[in-house]
């Protein structure tokens, strides 16, 4: 996944040269042999993203937050009252995600910027 670090953010980005948060999650899971459904929702539409995350939760299995599996989807609140951001837990307390003005980066799940924004960890239930 080192090759993904620093790739720019693009709304609707599905790779290989740019990603949005869901496009990156899809790429990481693909590398682990799991296909995720594609959602074509603008990153500017936080309420619609939140609604889609809620609607799709029955398809996902919630994991233990103390020791989440690798990979697992990290669902977060990001500047909103809706869950509107995703990343992928990659082990050792780290997750990879894509953000506007930052691009693809790896952060710690227990970092001050993220630990209170994580709603949960999930793996595909299909």
Residues covered by each model-derived region:
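...with weaker cross-activation on analogous glycine-rich loops/strands in unrelated enzymes
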Residues: 39-103, 109-110, 124-126
């Amino acid at each position: 996944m080192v090759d993904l670090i620093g790739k720019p953010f693009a709304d609707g980005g599905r790779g290989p040269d740019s990603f949005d948060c869901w496009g990156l999650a899809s790429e990481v899971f693909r590398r682990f042999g799991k296909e995720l459904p594609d959602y074509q929702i603008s990153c500017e539409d936080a309420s619609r993203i939140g609604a889609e995350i809620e609607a799709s939760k029955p398809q996902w299995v919630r994991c233990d937050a103390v020791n989440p599996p690798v990979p697992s989807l990290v669902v977060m609140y990001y500047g909103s009252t809706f869950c509107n951001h995703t990343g992928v837990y990659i082990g050792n307390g780290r997750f990879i995600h894509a953000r506007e003005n930052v691009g693809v980066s790896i952060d710690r799940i227990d970092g001050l910027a993220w630990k209170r924004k994580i709603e949960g960890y999930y793996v595909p239930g299909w």
